[in-house]
Amino acid sequence: MERKAIIEFKDFTAHYTVQSKPTLNNINLTIYEGEKVLIAGPSGSGKSTLANCINGLIPFSTDIEISGSLKIKGKETKDLSVFEISKMVGTVLQDPDSQFIGLTVAEDIAFKLENNCVSQEEMKKKVNYVSKIVDIENRLDLAPYSLSGGQKQRVTLAGTIVDDVDILLFDEPLASLDPAAGKASIELIDKIQKEEKKTVIIIEHRLEEVLNCDVDRIILMNEGEIIADTNPNEILASNKLKECGIREPLYITALKYSGYELNKEMNLENIDKLKLSDDGEKLKTWYKSLNFNKKEREEDTLLEFKNVSFSYDKKKDILSDINFKINRGDIVSVVGKNGAGKSTISKIICGFFKESKGDILFEGKSLDGKTIKERGEEIGVVLQNPNQMISKTMIFDEVALGLRVRGIDEKEVKERVIETLKTCGLYPYRNWPVSALSFGQKKRVTIASILVLNPKVIILDEPTAGQDYKHYNEIMEFLLKLNKKGVTIILITHDMHLMLEYTDKAIVISNGRKIADTTSAEILTDKEVIEKASLKETSLYDLALKFKLEDPKDFVCKFIDFDRGARN
């Protein structure tokens, strides 16, 4: 049966008028009806611009010059209005909150239908139908903002498919979801694509998670061009992911370390179907050759929670009887599903919230009675979105702000800011406006503005969210450098790769309670903890189980230790 093209780019170029080079350069691409396609590439590769050309935001809402041809369902998009394109292409944005319009879930899903003057009876039928597809039918009367991250995404998806569009475009659907919600999201997208016969395009950095369900093709982009367009097995067998600065699945890295020559016949995209000609003997031999010297550290407790509970209304505890210790010089992850209480812990440490029971000790002394300002002299917090922290126009002034507010002499301010900018790799940009920086560079500015105050602890909320692998590594290697200088680092994260690769210890929160406090490898190989906290087993553990390695937990620990050494 002949495939029918639904999206066709021919010699397509897009050039923002403020930039010297085209963002998309001579793109030739055909996507067929019913396909599921993953578009991946580093930041600035042009994938978002490509997506915005498909959904009509370009050229209608942007000052950009385009040439060549783009057809959707056989129609030239430059001859269509945004409204006409929106009847064919539905977009689910990275941030669901930015898409909500209705006061209830039902109202939000019905928004498109109201615009199309659909009768109330027909509207109710359609809303009920799509709400069942996305498993949100029991929450139609709730406010969208009261839902969890995964539920919010289901609402935006329902509002997109209610109009029966043929093409669904997902912009980083996993960015704000915990691992279990992310897995459920990918499974839901797969279900809709198959059952509703939709064409699905996913833009995402987190390749391994997307490949939990089959995709037909992966399109790799770099510097405005398509550098690969083929099936997942061929991509994974090549080195194109690393060449593009995209993180390959950890089990693929393990196979390469073991000495396997990868090829598409090995069914690399799925561990369950993975075939190794020697039944894993090379993997077993490599595992036996690994040494793991656990670093023993002297216990020097810096921060301690003692029976801490917290409640907004003195009725229901958000946190219940939390106990843990963090040693000086640690890098620690705090993990758990959305709404578990992770961010509440950081807010209590900083004094934004007051614990209702228990005590928090810092260097052996209670923080009770310490003001936010006093705590801020020892403990710094970096928010997920740097734009929420930045208040000055120029980089130097932003980093200097905290010192100037404290009345530090201007000569000392200059010395400390320059030293910090050099440490953060920002000195060449010291006289630049903050607006000229990339998202990752802005993140470093916010870290610098905290670091200049010489804190003993830095708490970072989702430090790598939305970052491609190159910028992810830059931020994490930078944090490791700070850690080596004695700064204790606490990471609140959903990223299981980050937890495994960079933190020796993790604290797991579930429904307001601490359920684990041990090594990252121990946590991500413990089925009970994983299920309770909506985490996800590492693919390394699955690989070890499939090929019957002697001790799967030990394999994960040794791989992480070896990989750190290889990367450094």
Curated annotation (Swiss-Prot):
Keywords: ATP-binding, Cell membrane, Membrane, Nucleotide-binding, Repeat, Translocase, Transport. ATP 2 binds at residues 336-343. ATP 1 binds at residues 41-48. It is found in: Cell membrane. One of its GO terms (molecular function) is ATP binding. Its EC number is 7.-.-.-. Pfam families: ABC_tran, DUF3744. Disulfide bonds: none annotated. InterPro entries: AAA+_ATPase, ABC_Co_transporter, ABC_transporter-like_ATP-bd, ABC_transporter-like_CS, ABC_transpr_CbiO/EcfA_su, ECF_ABC_transporter_ATP-bd, P-loop_NTPase. The keyword Protease does not apply. It comes from the Bacteria. Residues 7-248, 303-536 form the ABC transporter domain. GO terms for cellular component: ATP-binding cassette (ABC) transporter complex. It is a peripheral membrane protein. Probably part of an ABC transporter complex. Responsible for energy coupling to the transport system. Belongs to the ABC transporter superfamily. This is Putative ABC transporter ATP-binding protein CPE1583. It comes from Clostridium perfringens (strain 13 / Type A).
